Amino acid sequence: MLTPRDENNEGDAMPMLKKPRYSSLSGQSTNITYQEHTISREERAAAVGRHEGFRGCTIWFTGLSGAGKTTISFALERTLNKLGIPCYGLDGDNIRHGLCKNLGFSKEDRQENIRRVAEVAKLFADSGMICLAAFISPFQEDRLDARKIHESENVKFIEVHVSTTLEVCEQRDPKPSELYKKARAGQILGFTGIDSAYEPPENAEIILDAGKDGVQQCVQKVLDHLESKGLLPEQIPDVPAVRELFVSDDLTVAELLKESQNLPTVELTKVDLQWLQVLAEGWATPLSGFMRERQYLQSMHFGQLLDLKHKVAFVGEKSDDKEDSWPMMDDINQSIPIVLPISDDVKKGLEGVTRIALKYNGQVYAILSDPEIFEHRKDERVCRQFGTNDPRHPAVAQVLESGNWLLGGDVAVVQKIQFNDGLDKYRKTPNELRAIFAEKNADAVFAFQLRNPIHNGHALLMRDTREKLLAEHKNPILLLHPLGGWTKDDDVPLDIRIKQHEAVIAERVLDPEWTVLSIFPSPMMYAGPTEVQWHARSRIAAGIQHYIVGRDPAGIQKPGSPDALYETTHGAKVLSMAPGLSALHILPFRVAAYDKTAKKMSFFDTSRKEDFENISGTKMRGLARNGDTPPEGFMAPTAWEVLAGYYKSLQNSN
C-alpha cells in the first residue's frame, strides 16, 4: 500500500518546462515530485529594484491535484519576473523536500504543513516580493488560518481557486505516477477528491477554470486582478523574456547523452543546425522546438503565433488539452515557419517513438520529445512563403529538394552550437547581448541587419540614426547584426564580411564605444517583406527597441529577369503595420549615394541629382576584381582592402 498523497502537493499534468527531479526521501511519500522553476537566479536578480513602490503579497492557488496550480503559478512567476517584479513560487512538492520533510500525513501534520508555508509566504510578501503558493490545501479552515497569518500583519492575501473539475484532473493523470488511477484502485488512501474531501473556497478573490481556459488566459486573469488592486507598476517596459532551450544542468546533459545512445536519430543538415541554434538561443521565443502542425499553420496562414497548444482539433472534436505553459500575453509575429523536414524513409523509422536524438556530423545536439510528423506540402509552402515556386530561386529550391514530411516537437539542446570557424566569439545569444547592453548602460538599442559589406552610406545612416535617438536618449547603442546562416553562393562569405566590418569599426567609421558587432544565426530565405518581419521580430529577443529597415530588405532578383522579385519599398511598408511589432520603432532606410562634389557618401538630394552617383554592387565587385579603388570617401580604405582581396582571390581561383 502506498503512503497517502500529500493533500498539499501538486501533481499537475499540464506541461512542465524542465525535467523534474524525483524524491529520494526515505520514510516519506513516494508520490512527491520536485518541480523545477522555469527562471534562473540571474533572471530573478535582473528583476530586483526595477520599479518603485511596495507590492508584496501572497497569491494562494488551491485546487485538486492536476488542476493546473503549479503550471499556472510558475507561468505567472515567469511573467512577473519578465515585467521586473520580484516574485517566488512555493510548490507543495518542493516544500516537502525541505521545510516540511519531517511531517507526515496525519491531519495535525497537514495543518502544520500549511501553517509553516503560510508563515514563510508572509515573510516573502513582507519583504516586498509577490509570493506564489501552489497547494491543494483542501480544507477551508486551513486556508482561513493562512489568510489570518497574513492579514494580522497587514499583508495582502489573494486566494485563487483553480476550479478544474475532477473529471478533467483524472483525464490529465500523468504517467507513470497515475495517482488518480491508484487512488481509485485503493492503492493510495486519503487522496483528495477520491476518498478525502476537497472544500472549495467560498470567497476566493479569483476563480480560474483551467479545464476550459489555457495557461495564458489564466495568467492574464491574475494579472488583471493585480492591476486592479494597484499591485502592478503603471509603466511596464515591454521587454519579453527569452526562452532558451539549452539544458543547463551538467548531470541532466549526461543523462540525455546516455539516453541518446538508445534513441532513433535524425541527421540534421547544416541549415537545420542553424535553425536549431536560432531556437536554442531564444531568437524564436516562445517556440519550444521545431513547429508542430498547429504553429506551422498559424505561421503560414496568419503570419503569427496565436497559442502554444499542441494539436489542431476540428470543430466538434475534443482537444487533447496539451499546451505549452510559456506565457503568451498576446499574439506574436511569426511570418516564417521554423520546421525540420524529413524524408519518407526517416519517417518510417520514427513511427511510434516518443523521443528522438538530433545529430549533426555524428554529434548529438538535442533530444526532441513528444514528436509530431505531418505533411510538408512543399509547393503550397513556397508559394505562400516566397510568392513563387520557381526552383531558380535558391531558397525555393532548398525547400523543394527537402523531405516530404515535417517533424515537430520540443527540443532539449545539450550543447552550445558552435562552428569552430574563428567567428564563434561573435555569436552572442539574446541574453548575452542584453548583458552587454546593460554593461554599456544603454538606454536604447537600435539594430541594423545586413548580409553585404558596409560602405560609408550604410555607416552614415547608422550615425544619423544615433544622432536622432540622442534627442530622447543618453546612450543609444547600435547592434550591428550581420546574418550568419546560409546565404546564396554569390553572396560575400560570412568570414569576409566580418573582417570587413571589423575594419569599418577599427577605422572608427562606426564608433566602437557605441557599436556591438554580433552574428545573427538565422539562415537567409530571400523572402522579401515576409522575411523582413522575422528579421525585426527576432531582434526583440536581444532587447532592441528600434530597427532600421533597408530598401528591398531580404530581396532578390526575379529569376530570369533584371527586375527585383519584390517591390523594393514593400518591406518597409509592411513592417510599419505588421501585427505583433507595434512596440518596435521602425526606422526607414534613407537613400545614400556618392556625392561627387563633396567626395563622400551623402543622403540623396533631389535638388542636385547630377552631383550624385549610385555605385551599385555590380560596379563595386568589378572595381575590386580589377584591382581598382572606389572613389574617395566611398568605403573605409582597410575595409575595401578586405573586400578587394576576396574578389581578387576569386578571380585568381577561376
UniProtKB/Swiss-Prot annotation:
GO biological process, one term: sulfate assimilation
Functional pathway: Sulfur metabolism; sulfate assimilation
UniProt main location, coarse: nucleus
Enzyme Commission designation: 2.7.7.4, 2.7.1.25
Keywords: ATP-binding, Developmental protein, Kinase, Multifunctional enzyme, Nucleotide-binding, Nucleotidyltransferase, Nucleus, Transferase
PANTHER family: BIFUNCTIONAL 3'-PHOSPHOADENOSINE 5'-PHOSPHOSULFATE SYNTHASE, PAPS SYNTHETASE, ISOFORM D
Name listed for the protein in its UniProt record: Bifunctional 3'-phosphoadenosine 5'-phosphosulfate synthase pps-1
Native source species: Caenorhabditis elegans
